[in-house]
Amino acid sequence: MKFYDDVLNSNLSFEVANKLMKNKKQFATRPCWDGFHFYDKNGKYCILLKNGKVDNYTLDDVYDKEKNDWIIVTPTKRAIKLINNFIK
């Protein structure tokens, strides 16, 4: 199940996507992924996985940082419910 609806920006480097997540509280992913990456209310790097689980990661754990196909997305209503405790 895909946890995002709309793509707001595309073809971004991880560096740009990460800055948007961290500074603008946006959500990033890659076109081939169903979940997305975000920063929680405490500034921890998190990923909403395709199984609906949220895991904390470090930037060293992130795959495909060298790719330039990162996208900024809007979460689905279901995704917002799953991450609500992490962002509010």
Predicted regions and their residues:
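Structural boundary micro-motifs
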Residues: 1-88
